[in-house]
Design a protein with these regions (language model features):
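A hydrophobic, small-residue-rich beta->alpha segment in the mid-to-C-terminal subdomain
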Residues: 63-91
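Alpha/beta enzyme core
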Residues: 1-39, 53-58, 62-64, 82, ...
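Electropositive phosphate-/nucleotide-binding environments in soluble metabolic enzymes
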Residues: 24-28, 53, 71, 75, ...
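Residues that cap or flank secondary-structure elements
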Residues: 22, 47-48
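Active-site-proximal loop/turn and secondary-structure-junction residues that shape catalytic pockets
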Residues: 12-16, 49-51, 71-75
Length: 126
């Protein structure tokens, strides 16, 4: 269908942020219906953080081509930075230098993105 858009991000049970313990999962029935109506239009899954890998892979099989996992990146950054400070590394030498203080968080985001690229099957693709 020609909707005049390049990507479609529809709600199929996904949310931004952390998922509650009683989350019911993605609605693949809804995703399939959307894919049937939109044809080859690339679909986006917002709120990818915390969605089980098997659901992510099924969503990809049903046409999702972009998955947002910003919350997961932020959480990994915060955890690594917190650990750096809790270990007192910011008090050693010039550990307070923002380049040193923020480096563990940067590395954590990079590791998270690499892991997600593997899961999403996007390694080696432009």
């Amino acid at each position: 269908a020609d909707l005049g858009i390049d990507f479609l991000a529809a709600g199929i049970g996904n949310i931004h942020g952390k998922y509650p313990a009683n989350w019911k999962g993605l609605s693949f029935e809804t995703l399939d219906a959307i894919q049937q109506l939109t044809g080859d239009m690339p679909l986006v899954l917002h709120g990818g953080t915390g969605i089980p890998t098997d659901m992510i892979k099924k969503a990809i099989d049903l046409g999702v081509s972009k998955i947002n996992v910003n919350t997961e990146c932020q959480l990994s950054f915060a955890e690594a930075t917190r650990k750096y400070i809790e270990e007192g590394k910011d008090q050693q030498g010039k550990g307070y230098d923002p380049r040193k203080l923020l480096a563990p968080g940067f590395d954590a985001i990079k590791a998270t993105v690499k892991e997600k690229m593997e899961i999403f099957g996007s390694v080696g693709k432009a």
